[in-house]
Amino acid sequence: MRMGKIAVGYGFLLLLVFQLGVRASTLFNKYNVQELSSLKDLLERLEEKLSPGEESDVYAGSEDLVNDPEEDADLILDNVRKQAEKEFYKPAGFRDENLQRGRLRSIATSARSMNGCFGNRIERIGSWSSLGCNNSRFGSKKRIF
């Protein structure tokens, strides 16, 4: 009986909180609508002030630009040089980390390339067979002491 009263009380509080939340959000939404309408008015006034003749004045300097292929090539070379300098002048920690990654990758790939197998299986005590080996190349069974 006591649990029922507690559940009803919490349910009532939950309903009250939801109702207050809805009221707060509608007030908030009205405020946003008013703000949006004032921003639209400002935007329209700005567009009216800016005439089509003034728009061409803003971009008048763009006609003076000429695309020279030699200048473009020089810019590309400069960017490549800057990138190379950034790589060269990186802190030693970054370079060492990349070297370590490369060494680990080479170890992992070299073991696979030398052996050609990816695992072994014990058939019985003292007898091993290669699982992923090409049988014609490595034979069907390998004996390990």
Swiss-Prot record:
It comes from Acipenser transmontanus (White sturgeon). GO terms for molecular function: hormone activity; hormone receptor binding. Exhibits natriuretic and vasodepressor activity. Belongs to the natriuretic peptide family. It comes from the Eukaryota. It is found in: Secreted. Its main location: secreted. GO terms for biological process: blood vessel diameter maintenance; cGMP biosynthetic process; cGMP-mediated signaling; negative regulation of systemic arterial blood pressure; neuropeptide signaling pathway; receptor guanylyl cyclase signaling pathway. Residues 1-24 form the signal peptide. The keyword Disulfide bond applies. Disulfide bonds join C117-C133. Keywords: Disulfide bond, Hormone, Secreted, Signal, Vasoactive. This is Ventricular natriuretic peptide. InterPro entries: Natr_peptide, Natr_peptide_CS, Natriuretic_peptide. Heart atrium and ventricle, and to a very low extent in brain. One of its GO terms (cellular component) is cytoplasm.
